[in-house]
Amino acid sequence: MRLNAILAGCALAVAALRAVADPVSGSTTGAWIHPDPAASPIATTGVGTSTFTWGVAAGTPTPNILGFHAVAGGFSSVTETPFKVGSISYYNGTTESGTTPDSVDLALTLDFTDPAIPAVTSDYTFKLVSTPNQGKDPDADADYVYLPSAFSATSFVIGSTTYNVKLTGFENIVGDGFLTSNDLAFHVRENGTASADLFAVVTTQTAVPEPQAVALMLAGLGMLGLLARRRG
């Protein structure tokens, strides 16, 4: 009976240990890469940087702009809890027809201070849709940026713990005030802007001894205690 109670107590202790959240901290960098297509007359600037422009401006001060903005001072959270890694901003400039690519990738790197796991770098594709402007209906002339929605996890094993790092998606979407933007797409009028925050999460899995192994360990400890009492 006492052994059952001890086993139950051990199980509760293990569950409690697994439920303890560990600190997560680090920094994020993002760079826009691989505009497609990229050959002339497609016009782009900022490839390899955090600010990407595309198209030849026609009627607005600048062409279209996508920006990645890392969290100032880096991110700080705990495991199992989503945290903000940065934000995306979009400005819809008016551009000449035929000068805009169809997509661009964001190379996003999460560099961890805690836990001590390697940096995670992944590429995410943003679809760019430039609508021909008719000048009659600003909503019909609005452009789209389709946000990535599929995020795979990257796993690392340190000791007996598996760390899974995964983007969870976009939140806190702010549209241009006229059209609805969401976590799937920015839909923005000419000369308008939209933004969204990007979140990630680190989850853990810790190897737990099998019940039989725990029982054997406790039995061994019991025998040691019995021998110690006899010697005493």
Regions found by a protein language model. Name each.
Residues 1-2:
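N-terminal secretory signal peptides that target proteins for export/translocation
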Residues 5-24, 197-226:
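Short, threonine-centered small-residue motifs that mark membrane-proximal processing/anchoring sites
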Residues 22-207:
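Mature extracellular "passenger" or substrate-interacting domains of secreted, surface-exposed proteins
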Residues 229-232:
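Short, charged juxtamembrane terminal tails flanking transmembrane helices
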